[in-house]
Amino acid sequence: MAVVINKGIFIVAAKRTPFGKMGGALKDVHPSDLLAVAAKEAFKAGNVAPSLIDTSNIGQVYTLSGTSDGGLSPRHAALKAGIPQEKPALGINRLCGSGFQ
């Protein structure tokens, strides 16, 4: 008999963005686009549809990076990854430990 759990908090997969250097190959990639790629890959690895996500927790350093997103990069990334608009997104800045939280 299969057990289905429909309440609780689940981490089904995680992915990270690549490291880069200032002015390097990623300098023209918008932060929310890069975050959206990582989110889509996590959905794929966890075999989860974006529509099933209730809340996005996105770890990111330098959230106010001078881009048009400003501090909204996690929210914009969630939307670009296909998470429904009515679902919240939380940006976490713990410097090097951002992704671990």
Name the predicted role of every residue range.
Residues 1, 57-61:
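Short intrinsically disordered, low-complexity coil segments enriched in acidic
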Residues 2-32, 41:
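Condensing-enzyme catalytic core mediating Claisen C-C bond formation in acyl metabolism
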Residues 25, 29-31, 51, 79, ...:
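Active-site loop-to-helix "anion-binding N-cap" substructures in soluble metabolic enzymes
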Residues 32-47, 73-77:
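Short, well-ordered amphipathic alpha-helical segments that serve as non-catalytic structural scaffolds
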Residues 49-57, 85-88:
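Short acidic capping loops at alpha-helix termini that bridge into adjacent secondary structure
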Residues 62-101:
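Conserved catalytic cysteine-centered active-site region
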